[in-house]
Every structure is written in C-alpha cells, then in structure tokens.
C-alpha cells in the first residue's frame, strides 16, 4: 500500500528485502512454496512474490515468480479449483488465494493459460448459486450444508470480478446485495478482508457504506 520495495531506498526497504529473502528461501521444490503446510501457504506466498516482481520487475525474482505460477497452474483440479493438496477437488477458500496470485501474475506480465482461467470460471459456476448465480458456497452452491457463509460470498464475488465472471449485471447485483446486507464486520477478519476487496472493486453505494463503517472500526 505504501509502495515500499526492496530495490529502492525507502523507509522499510530493509524490512521488505529481508522478508523477501526469507520467503524465497522457503521454496522446497521448483515453484513449490508449501513448506510444511499446504496449498494455502503456497497461494499466499505466491501472491507476495508475484506482487514483489510486478512492482519492481526485478529480473532476479522473475524465475521464481514464474515458478510459483506454474505450480498453481499444474495443481488445478479438473473442475477448476484448488484445495489443500495439488490436484484435489477445490474449495472456494483455498481457490481464492490462487485466483489472486494468477491475476497478479497476469498483470505482472506472466502469461496464464487460457485453459486455467476457463477452469476457474467453471469452478465459480459450480460453487455459485442464488437467484442469478451471485451467491457463493464453499465447495458447492449455496443451500447445501457447508455453503452460503458471508466470507465465501465475498471470496466468490471478488474472484468473479478478477476473472470478469461478474460482467453479468444481475449476478453482480445479487453479489453486491449480499455484501451490502452483511456489511463490514471486523469480528470475522477473513470476511472483512475479502469483503473489502470485493466492495472496493464494485464501488458505488456498497463501497461507500463499507468504507464508512470500516474507518469507524479502525480509526
């Protein structure tokens, strides 16, 4: 948010550099950032690395940025999502981090296969539901036992925005209504994170209401 980077003099240059040094040292295989964890760890680490490359275009980061993206592409399930292990049938929570990393990679100049994006859009259809497809569940469409939570609606809405799957006005309106109805809630930090991303992308009254309450909570 501040534009701090490891390759130019700035207030937190050393912190960012040391953080990147530590992060790159965690690679356990070509492009594999899971460490002793799972695909959650990989997705979050991949997002950080690709963002660092995208901001700086540091050629030393390019091979690793490409590697972590390739690992995501190769780990995608045939239905288009991701879960704890490579190739496992997806859930929307883990998949959200992969979609963010892929979108960041594409914006940074790393090519993403068309088939990968088609898979993501297909997965969003699987976990989508509601009247116009703008409500999202965890591993299945809302209405089933493990679906329909506010956080998952926010993740699905944001992923749809990143993949341009929310171009359908009715679908986007339904997603926005759910987000607006739930409102900002700092007690659920995961929902607050994704809800902020989705509300900001959507803009309009939904974002204005969201940011007003968020500022009151934080400031």
Can you name each region flagged by the protein language model?
Residues 1-15, 29-70, 74-119, 126-177, ...:
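An alpha-helical repeat/solenoid feature that recognizes helix-turn-helix modules
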Residues 18-20:
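Membrane helical hairpin/interfacial module
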Residues 23:
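Patatin-like phospholipase
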